[in-house]
Structure formats: C-alpha cells, structure tokens
Amino acid sequence: MSVLTEFKAFAVKGNVVDMAVGIIIGAAFGKIVSSFVGDVIMPPLGLLIGGVDFSDLAVTLRPAQGTAPAVLLAYGKFIQTVIDFIIVAFAIFMGVKAINRLKREEAKAPTLPPTPSKQEVLLSEIRDLLKAQNTPAAPITVDPARTL
C-alpha cells in the first residue's frame, strides 16, 4: 500500500474529519469569546474598578533607550487571557453538562421488553406440556377451545 493511499485512508476516517471540524469550530469560537471578553466584558469591568483598561496594564522592566523599545511585563494581557479562558471553560462546562443531562434522560427512559411472537408463545406452551408429561404427579390438561 502506498503512502498516498494510506494517508487518504487515514484522512477520510470519520474520527479524523470530526476532529478537524471540531478544531476549526473551536478556533472560531475562541475568536468570538476573545472579542466578547475584550469588547463587551472588559470595558464595563474596567469602569467598575476605576476606568482601568486591562490590556494596557504593564510593568516597565527597562525604559526605552534610543531606538530600543521598552521592555514591558504586560500582565494586563495575561489577565484578559485568563478571563477568556474562564469564560471558554465555563461555556464548555455548560455544554457538557447539558449533553450529560440529555444522556441521563435518555438512559432513564424505560424500554419495554418485546412481546413474544405467536411462535414463541406456542413453543413455551409445548415446553410446559412436555415438562408436565415427564412429571408423573401432574395431570395433563389441554384446552379444547384453543386452536392452533
């Protein structure tokens, strides 16, 4: 089997395609959450704590010297990334929780045992009659009104 054929068989498998779709959707979802946090959550939060813009928070480790830029420890971006992570983790948690609830409800639904077919009922009756014949103390009774 050639490498190209093996790769084609690998790439077309359902799991690989599903994983690729999940990664692409996850990346797009990450962009949405980052925008939500940066554009919707952080501005009001900054106003509540005194007009601070988290993305600009930094500690200058070395000031700019001539053409060399300043060396900054940009902890504000880190805070924003942590908030992004918390929101994404919470959204995923809620999604998994909903899926698990649906699975539990599906598992709780009682399944009725299948009703036996006519053949199974007749075979059970024949079995019971044969057992009764092999037992000397039990009389054999046949219902003449019953027809096969």
Curated annotation (Swiss-Prot):
GO terms for cellular component: plasma membrane. It is found in: Cell inner membrane. InterPro entries: Mechanosensitive_channel_CS, MS_channel, MSC/AndL, MscL_channel. It holds the Pfam family MscL. GO terms for molecular function: mechanosensitive monoatomic ion channel activity. The chain crosses the membrane at residues 9-29, 79-99. Belongs to the MscL family. Homopentamer. Channel that opens in response to stretch forces in the membrane lipid bilayer. May participate in the regulation of osmotic pressure changes within the cell. This is Large-conductance mechanosensitive channel. It comes from Pseudomonas syringae pv. tomato (strain ATCC BAA-871 / DC3000).
